[in-house]
UniProtKB/Swiss-Prot annotation:
Organism the protein comes from: Pasteurella multocida (strain Pm70)
Biological processes per GO annotation: amino acid biosynthetic process; aromatic amino acid family biosynthetic process; chorismate biosynthetic process; shikimate metabolic process
Positions annotated to bind NADP(+): E77, G126, A127, G128, G129, A130, N149, R150, T151, L152, S153, K154, M213, G238
Reaction equation(s) it catalyzes: shikimate + NADP(+) = 3-dehydroshikimate + NADPH + H(+)
Role played: Involved in the biosynthesis of the chorismate, which leads to the biosynthesis of aromatic amino acids. Catalyzes the reversible NADPH linked reduction of 3-dehydroshikimate (DHSA) to yield shikimate (SA).
EC number, as in UniProt: 1.1.1.25
Protein name per UniProt: Shikimate dehydrogenase (NADP(+))
Pathway(s) the chain acts in: Metabolic intermediate biosynthesis; chorismate biosynthesis; chorismate from D-erythrose 4-phosphate and phosphoenolpyruvate: step 4/7
Disulfide bonds: none
Keyword set includes NADP: yes
Length: 269
């Protein structure tokens, strides 16, 4: 049976084994998918042994995405621009193909929600790795991006790098123009620490829709909770993105695209 895994540290909380088992059942694919704890020191060696033993592919989560990128022999364009890899596939010739399905997952979930139309203006909060992983697919979907970060130079560097792919500008988090954004995406890690992004609430109130790339199992993320407190209706966390990026990885490995929307409706958590 073909073997797959998700590598991360920590990894016990991962929903990926459940997600991929549902996809396998849905598409009649015979495969095994497990969670593997990566070692900070020996991750590269662990991964080499994993593939030497016949594994067909794996997902990579924090904190190993950049290291997996370095290990891959070939990369997709979206993986190259992200400079991070969340999906590896072993090719027939033994080489490792690196991909990044985070942005594709985000785009798929925004389409599911009906929040992605051409020529929209999207405000993205944060200019870290999460943002870098989704910029190319958003720009390819003809979105106009405003990138806001506390350190302006970091946002400017990203905007300059991605300018060839579409319309993108950088602003300081404290100087976001007060306008009606079609969509605001929180790509900061503040929710992991139980905090919200410190910014002008008027900007959130004026937005048509708001999306948090983080997700929480039992309760709203801090960002989602804040948006709801402000009376916003079109608010979502990133659980759909998690499931959709897994669907794109599954498609890369197995050649069949599972229906991720059906999984979101199941009481499987």
């Amino acid at each position: 049976m073909d073997k797959y895994a998700v590598w991360g540290n920590p990894i016990a909380q991962s929903k990926s084994p459940q997600i991929h088992q549902i996809f396998a059942n849905q598409t009649q694919q015979q495969m095994e998918y497990v969670a593997m704890l990566g070692d900070e020191q020996d991750f590269e060696q662990q991964l080499r042994v994993f593939f030497e033993k016949g594994a067909k592919g794996c997902n990579i989560t924090a904190p190993f995405k950049e290291r997996a990128f370095q290990l891959a022999d070939l990369h997709s364009e979206r993986c190259l621009t992200a400079e991070a890899c969340n999906t590896l596939k072993k090719l027939d010739d033994g080489r490792l193909y690196g991909d990044n399905t985070d942005g594709a997952g985000l785009v798929s979930d925004l389409q599911r929600l009906g929040w992605l139309k051409p020529e929209q203006t999207i405000l993205i909060l944060g200019a870290g790795g999460a943002t870098k992983g989704v910029l190319l697919p958003l720009l390819q979907a003809k979105q106009h991006i405003v990138l806001a970060n506390r350190t302006l130079s970091k946002a400017e560097d990203l905007a300059q790098k991605f300018a060839q792919y579409g319309q993108i500008q950088a602003v300081e988090l404290d100087n976001i123009p007060v306008q009606s954004f079609d969509l605001i995406i929180n790509a900061t890690s503040s929710g992991l620490h139980g905090q919200t992004v410190q910014m002008n609430p008027e900007i959130l109130q004026n937005a048509t829709a708001l999306y948090d790339m983080q997700y929480a199992k039992q309760a709203d993320t801090p960002f989602v909770a804040l948006c709801k407190q402000l009376g916003k209706q079109n608010v979502s966390d990133g659980f759909g993105m998690l499931v959709a990026q897994a669907a794109h990885a599954f498609h890369l490995w197995r050649g069949v695209m599972p229906e991720f929307e059906a999984l979101l409706e199941q009481e499987w958590l």
